[in-house]
Regions:
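Flexible, glycine-rich phosphate/dinucleotide-binding loops
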Residues: 12, 41, 90-92
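FMN-binding flavodoxin-like domain, especially the glycine-rich phosphate-binding loop
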Residues: 16, 24-28, 33, 47-158
């Protein structure tokens, strides 16, 4: 199996996740080629069994570079894709001290739904989606993030 992994990491968290994913999949005999979206053309994707897209979340959306990359994507119809994002961890409300509920988080964190909409609009088929939380604006990644990446890798059929 061949996986092409496209990320838009700005502060290095996405690169860490991509490298960990590639390492986990290599142990299963899967080849993973990791690319930053600035280094490849959305119009000339290399052939692959699975395309994986990863973007950090900014203000609840994928960063602009990734949105533009996905809008200009020229992918084969019916190609399989997965999404693995890095998003800010929910912070307690300053007045009440309570963490937002999952419903409230889903209302404001729209990274995966926006990316899915763009990719399915390009004729691709979703295989899996997941997220790894970042504890600060520039990192670090949450404790136990490697286990999340491993579980995500397990969700992808080899």
């Amino acid at each position: 199996m061949n996986v092409e992994y496209f990320h838009a990491s700005k502060y290095g968290n996405g690169v860490k996740v991509a490298d960990e994913f590639a390492r986990r999949m290599a142990s299963r005999g899967v080849t993973v080629n990791v690319h930053h979206i600035k280094d490849v053309s959305a119009k000339a994707l290399p052939p692959a069994d699975l395309y994986l897209f990863s973007s950090p979340g900014r203000m609840g959306k994928p960063i602009g570079g990734m949105r533009r990359f996905l809008k200009g994507l020229d992918a084969p119809a019916g190609a399989r894709y997965a999404i693995l994002t890095t998003e800010g961890a929910p912070q307690p409300d300053k007045k009440t001290g309570q963490i937002p509920t999952q419903e409230e988080q889903d209302k404001y964190q729209r990274v995966i739904p926006i990316m899915s909409e763009l990719l399915t609009g390009a004729g691709m088929v979703e295989v899996a989606a997941g997220k790894v939380l970042v504890t600060g604006m520039r990192g670090p990644l949450e404790d136990g993030w490697e286990a999340k990446v491993d579980a995500f890798a397990d969700a992808i059929e080899v």
